[in-house]
Amino acid sequence: MRTVTVGTRGSTLALAQTRWVVARLKEEWPETDFRIQTISTKGDRNRESLEQLAQKGDKGFWVKEIEEALLAKKIDIAVHSLKDLPTEQPEGLEISSIPKRVDGRDALIGREGMKKLAELPEGARIGTSSVRRKAFLRAYRPDLIVKDLRGNIDTRLAALGSGEYDAIILAAAGLIRTEQRHRIDEFVDPDILLPAPGQGALALETRTEDDLTIEVAYAIHDHATDDRITAEREFLAGLGAGCMAPVGAHAVIKNGLLTLEGWVGALDGTQVIRATSQGDVAECADIGAELAADMLERGAAELIEAVRE
């Protein structure tokens, strides 16, 4: 029996989504023994805020050590939250499979009487770690107090329960994958808050020359998700931005057409650029690149660069 070692971070969410991946792979490859190996990353150990890390321009914050293990052949497949992956893979590695995306939206969880983002009272304390969400909240609701909130899902929920925050915003996918969908009070519509590029999707990364493992991983690949993700990540790459930039993107496919909406905001909420591009789904990469070029002409680079200063 062949053994395939699957590497992941050790958080509750990372393990939940990796176990989901392994269960799907076992359905396709019942004669293969899949083993999970947890790996600590810089993101797990560093206590700085994501704003501080964005200023440093850190890339691969959540994935570098896992990719190093993959290159060293200590693991065969790496499972990542796709939104955490830089838009370029290290030499010798590739994204070989993107399973079907779950809900890509952001989710709000609030205390009693704090269940809708638009209805939060003036001065309400809202917690998030994301630079993108902070920029959005300061633009959309400048009357709110935006507070930093880091830690795993359980830590963030506990912080809400302690009374330190009136509401928090998390990725809906994380709550769904950890079987806590019932905690969500509001799925924030992308028309209001665009998710991070790739949010809600997973990536299976392998060594480029490992054809056997690539075949194993590709068995759970979802083409529609791949098309949407390609547009979103080409948009991010075209902006020269990374996963900690104040950038949102959301692609939708309908009747063979892919519509991509992009958003870039100033961290202090004083300026927002939002635009849409559409085309045949086969041109998904070009759609993302064209939208990035359009937004660069409108000053997006200055907003992204300001976060690093």
UniProtKB/Swiss-Prot annotation:
Its EC number is 2.5.1.61. It holds the Pfam family Porphobil_deamC. It catalyses: 4 porphobilinogen + H2O = hydroxymethylbilane + 4 NH4(+). GO terms for biological process: heme biosynthetic process; protoporphyrinogen IX biosynthetic process. CDD domains: PBP2_EcHMBS_like. SUPFAM superfamilies: Periplasmic binding protein-like II, Porphobilinogen deaminase (hydroxymethylbilane synthase), C-terminal domain. GO terms for cellular component: cytoplasm. The modification S-(dipyrrolylmethanemethyl)cysteine is found at C243. Signal peptide: none annotated. Binds 1 dipyrromethane group covalently. It comes from the Bacteria. The keyword Transmembrane helix does not apply. Keywords: Porphyrin biosynthesis, Transferase. PROSITE patterns: PORPHOBILINOGEN_DEAM. InterPro entries: HemC, Porphobilin_deaminase_cofac_BS, Porphobilin_deaminase_N, Porphobilinogen_deaminase_C, Porphobilinogen_deaminase_C_sf. Its cofactor is dipyrromethane. One of its GO terms (molecular function) is hydroxymethylbilane synthase activity. Pathway: Porphyrin-containing compound metabolism; protoporphyrin-IX biosynthesis; coproporphyrinogen-III from 5-aminolevulinate: step 2/4. Tetrapolymerization of the monopyrrole PBG into the hydroxymethylbilane pre-uroporphyrinogen in several discrete steps. Belongs to the HMBS family. The porphobilinogen subunits are added to the dipyrromethane group. Monomer. This is Porphobilinogen deaminase. It comes from Deinococcus radiodurans (strain ATCC 13939 / DSM 20539 / JCM 16871 / CCUG 27074 / LMG 4051 / NBRC 15346 / NCIMB 9279 / VKM B-1422 / R1). The lineage of its organism: Bacteria, Thermotogati, Deinococcota, Deinococci, Deinococcales.
